[in-house]
């Protein structure tokens, strides 16, 4: 009984030790990370809200124009109907 409890305790301690080793630093230095964070905080945003809004609007209009261009072959425009011949306009031939 003592041997199995000793093996179990050794196994649990070994597992805890492996977890502890895996939680160590992942490369780089903490001082370097802090310097990068300070540089990022000190930077001011380049775009204003109005510029961001106009950029978003221009993207949406570009997408709408692209969809219109792709769909114009499948759906004829109601604004520009095809020209009809005089027969279809109701003009009869007078012989």
From Swiss-Prot:
Keyword Aminoacyl-tRNA synthetase: no
Keyword Glycoprotein: no
A Gene Ontology molecular function term of the record: growth factor activity
Compositionally biased tracts (Basic residues): 80-95
Modified residues (Hydroxyproline): 86
Cleaved propeptide residues: 25-73, 90-95
Annotated spans, Disordered: 72-95
Tissues expressing the protein: Expressed in roots.
Keywords for this protein: Differentiation, Growth factor, Hydroxylation, Secreted, Signal, Sulfation
GO biological process, one term: positive gravitropism
Residues with Sulfotyrosine modification: 75
Cellular component terms per the entry's GO annotation: extracellular region
Residues spanning the signal sequence: 1-24
Entry's family note: Belongs to the RGF family.
Misc: 'Golven' means irregular waves in Dutch.
The protein's name: Protein GOLVEN 9
Species annotation: Arabidopsis thaliana (Mouse-ear cress)
Gene: GLV9
């Amino acid at each position: 009984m003592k041997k199995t409890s000793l093996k179990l305790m050794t196994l649990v301690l070994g597992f805890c030790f492996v977890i502890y080793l895996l939680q160590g630093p992942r490369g780089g230095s903490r001082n370097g990370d802090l310097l990068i964070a300070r540089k990022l905080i000190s930077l001011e945003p380049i775009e204003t809200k109005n510029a961001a809004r106009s950029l978003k609007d221009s993207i949406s209009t570009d997408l709408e124009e692209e969809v219109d261009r792709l769909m114009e072959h499948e759906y004829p425009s109601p604004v520009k109907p095809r020209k009809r011949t005089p027969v279809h306009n109701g003009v009869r031939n007078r012989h």
